[in-house]
Structure formats: structure tokens, C-alpha cells
Amino acid sequence: MNLSTKLEVSKNRLNTFFPLRTKDERKELDWDSILGNVISEVYRKQLAVENLTDFQAMCEQELKQRLDDDAFWPVLKAMYFDSSDVLKIAPEFLLFRSEEAEDNKHNQRIGDMFVNLMGGKTLLNLSPMRLNFVEQILFDVLENKALKPEAKMKKRVFKEQPYLPFLAQCFKDDLAFLGSKPRYLLDSFQDFLRLYGFLYTSQLAHNLVNWSEGEPKPCPNYLILDTEKASAERKQLKESGYQQLYNHVLRIFPYLTMAEMLQAGRDEVRPLWLLADSIRNFDPATALLNDFAQSFKDERQLIKVQVNAQPDSISALRQVLQLSRDQFKTGNKDKDDINTNFAKATIKHLCADFIQQRGAAGSVLVMNQDYLLLLTNLVIGSNESLRLNELIKGFNQRGVFFDKQSQAEIVQFYERIGNVERMSDSGDAVYVRKTV
């Protein structure tokens, strides 16, 4: 049983399974810094130099030793350092991005979210970049002089198991594919992280609603292309689109903080769905949770809320989770705003690229062509092409759903860019090729 045997009501603290905190609405994410943090874990490399200026001095010294004419250095400096193009040589150079950000803890937590999706494992079998003569020298300086030897690297321990195993597997597969194409990785890594930030947030929110149904699975989350019209007649978009997402995001802070409270003192905080599985049909948990519900109601002064003795452990846990939401519906604006502001921060920081205002239709979930192409390439992966219905299944497995109207628009988009072929006279067998 993952439930603590001594349940005590405490402050709401969120330390697991989601990177944002209640005060993060006022902050801005630095995706370059997040990218640098993830690169450090993916490549298992850490900088030994303080900043890019120190690295520039190392490169100047090395290149002047190799160049016949010192006058070449200012030209190279302008090409690579003044323009920051040095950061585009290879993914490892993005390590410098993480050193540039101030007030970096929230960016570090976002980076940790992606590392947790990897299961704490690094991907060491990444294909090398093809570099020109000068770039190879700069890369060698980075590798041989500007990075810490492995013995001196800080080793971080990631105990947290993935909350969404299905999405963690997709993330690892997609990252492995990107690692086989380092130039594409370099060009698209930030978009890749932004995409998975949205996918993780939306699927976590939806699966928190289904906490009693066992291991999470992809939940309907309907988007349209950003070039489409959003009519009110599109049932799936209306029922399983933006409004559903926002309503479910409101559960992230209450449910996850409650899950931590119920596992206080345990060596590891398990996902809520695993906590539920561990107490199912376990009578002692029922009494513990019933007593805790009354204590929580009293401590939070939820006068208008009724608490009843529940007959089984899952019903008792359901009541406790409802109380976790009720504490932010008291009419006390300061208290109620805690969860509302957390939800706004979540939408702002991790979902904004995928939301548009559409007049009378209100907010809708959208995907632009850049993200669609990236997602298409990721799903096709090591294959040369995929049949359209298999591609759509791959979208769904990652938490991206399109109705039939959007699917038709997607095929038209593929035809315009020339990466689709029809393998039968009727045109029923549509295959989509990747663009990398």
C-alpha cells in the first residue's frame, strides 16, 4: 500500500509529476535555457567554463595557433561568436543556453519534466554532425577543454517514475529518431520540447480525471489546423477541445498536492493512479481516508461541504480528491485564486502555442504547419512512409486527435508540399512520406 499509515493534513505542496508552482504565473519561461538543461542530460555533458565568453577565448587561442594569419580571427569571431552562430554548430553547443538565464529554477524544473519522460536515462548513441574544418576545431575545443570530465560531473538522481508511461515511451522513441538526425535535432529541438510540454500537460490533465481506471492511456484531445475555421457544429472539437482541457487543468494542482499529502513520509511519491491501485479492496485504507476527509474538512474550514463515511477505499479516495478541489471554491478570493492562477500559468507556459481565439467559437486548440510536419516526421520515424490511418493512430498515441474534417485538410496540406502518394486507382491507400 502506497498510502501513508499516519495521514496528517498539511500545506499544499507540489513537488512531483508537474514542473510549475503557484507563483510561476508571473515568470517567463526561457526555452533556450530549458533546451540547454535537457541537452546536458541527453548527452550527459556539463560545462567546465563559466560562459560563452570564456569559451570564445579558448577558441581564439586555439585558432591563432593553427592559422597562418592572425587577421582571420576577427572574421571567424564575427561569423560564429558575434552572431551566436556558434550555438548552431552542433546540439552540444546549446549547453551554453542554460548558463545565460537568470532565476533559472522554474526553467530547470521544466527541463526535469522532459528528463523524467526519458525515465532518467540518457541517449548516448547519437549520430555525429558533419562539420567543416573550422567548426570541427570549435567542436574539438568544446569537447576537450570546455566540458567537465565525467568523473567531475554532478550526477543527478531522478527517482520519479513517469506518470504517463505511454507518452514516456513515445518521447523516448521520438528522441531516439531525432538523435539519428542531429541537424534536424538541432533545428527542431525547441519545437520538439514545446510540443511535448503541451502533450504532457494535456494528457496529464485528462488522465487525472480517470485516476481510478488504472494505467493512463491517450485521451481524446481534439485540435484543428490553425488555418481552419472552427464551427460550432464540430461536436468532437466542442466536447473534447479547449474547454475540456481547461476544466481538467484545474485538477492538476489539487489532485497532485493531495496525492503527495496522502503519501507523506514514503520513500517515493507514486502517481495517483498507482496509489489508487495499491489501496483497491484494502479495507484499512477506507477507514484511514474517511478519518482524513473529516480532518481535512475541519482544518480547511469547509463549512458548506458534507463529508460522509464511504463504504470502500476508492470511494473514500474520491471524496478526499473532491475535498482537494472544494478548498479552492470557498468564496475567499485569495484562496480560490491559488488554483485559478496555477491553471492560468499552466495554459500560458505550456499550452499557449496550441491555443487560438476564434471569435464566437471562443478558444480552440490548434496546430500550425511547423508542428504538424514535426509530429508527422516523428510518427513516421525510421520508416520512409506510413499509411495515413497508421499516421493518425500515431498522432492519437501521442495525445493529438483530429476529426474527419481536419484529417481531410491535413491530406490537402501534405499534397501541397508533395509528401503524399496514392497507391491505388481509387486513391483510398494514401501514404505519407517524412520530409527529413
Question: What is each of the regions a protein language model found here?
Answer:
Residues 400-413:
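Short amphipathic alpha-helical interaction segments
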